Amino acid sequence: SSWGAFNIMSSALNNQNINLEIVKIAEGISIGFEITPLGAIFGLVASFLWIFAAIYSVGYMRGNNEKNQTRFYAFYAIAVHAALCIAYAGDLLTLFIFYEVLTFSTYPLVTHKQNEMAQKAGRLYMSILVGSSVILLLPAIIWVWVATGSLEMSQNGVLDGKIDVAYAPLLLAMFVFGIGKAALMPIHKWLPAAMVAPTPVSALLHAVAVVKAGVFTMLIVLTNVFGIDFLAKTGASEWLIWLASFTLLATSIIAIYKDDLKARLAYSTISQLSYITLGGALATSMATQGAALHIITHAAGKITLFFVAGALYVGAKITKISDLNGHGKSASLIFLAFFIGSLSIIGVPPMAGSWSKFFLMLGAADSGYEVVIGVFCISTILNAFYLMEIPARAFFFKKEREVSVKIPKLILIPTLITSFLT
């Protein structure tokens, strides 16, 4: 699938028009696929990182002696392929169908441990993601069909001249809060709750498929349904700029106070997703490019950080940041990978994450929202504070207890490779 995604990306870069209609239900309503530049980017990221996630998951599941591994791998594969179908969806109906397939296929992964905490997390996961999509996203899609007579999308948007400008912010709100996978406040609580799942699932949720499908869908709606020119002209996304900015900063502050490593990374993810939503809401070409690039850079960086969290659990049964003191020498390569991945998430030049943040800042300046540049800068400081604490504790704090750290090679190798992709 990675080679196919690479060929699709090449076709998109060469402006080749590739589309496939599977079923035509009615005029303007069909199930089919079409290659867009943004979809090609998401498809390539998901399929490429899945290789390392799959290898890592074998090492993790075996190293941790997890039960029901066959079921786990089956749903893991279904989830990734659902994400690819979202990436290449040619219309809103196809997008919605595979958006739901992704939700239902990841539920068994979230509840894999089958204990009370996993079941509770699974109920919250399904209630928020399915509830938001059925109550808000589906009606929003129907509204677009009523307004335009079609569920097809366009690179310039489809709503200009088709909808009363006064109703545009309301329709956008239905889409934004209907796309629960983008994890904007206040519909973000499913993501930290889902951290009870095995670490390969966390990597799938945060880097490869689920949340990336959410922000990809958000960008598609902002650019290919509304259109950045329509948003800039009407100001329909102004409220979203402030909501995304608030989410970005608030979750960064919350992350600082989380001692559980996966919980801290979960709130970090919510913050980083808001960068992408904010880039789309700014409604400039530069900001949109920055948002698309941030999908790539955050995916590589965050999958590395979660790989490290899983490695520490399998190798030393460490889950708390406060328990990392002095263990840097016994797991130096793992903490080096975390350090490199963190530099990219923070946005330290010349790491990949610095380029996406640079384009986002340029986009903020182009849009006239200079205050957003300040939001990005404050967030970067907060990122450094809550991420650099981990390697700092490992290498510079005094060891409080002796722990034997043994990292399986199937965990170590993918972690090191993804760290160098950042």
Feature names for model-found ranges:
Residues 1, 44, 129-133, 242, ...:
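Hydrophobic H-region at the start of alpha-helical membrane spans
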Residues 1-74, 149-158, 220:
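Transmembrane helix-loop-helix hairpins at membrane boundaries of multipass inner-membrane proteins
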Residues 3-14, 138-145, 345-348, 422:
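C-terminal TM-helix exit segments that contain a strictly Trp-centered aromatic cap at the helix terminus
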Residues 13-42, 92-95, 99-110, 178, ...:
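Membrane-interface helix-loop-helix modules in multi-pass inner-membrane proteins
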Residues 47, 210, 353-356, 414-418:
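Core segments of transmembrane alpha-helices
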Residues 52-62, 67-70, 76-95, 105-358, ...:
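Hydrophobic transmembrane alpha-helices and their helix-loop junctions in integral membrane proteins
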Residues 329-334, 384, 388-422:
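Cytoplasmic/organellar membrane-interface segments at the starts of transmembrane helices
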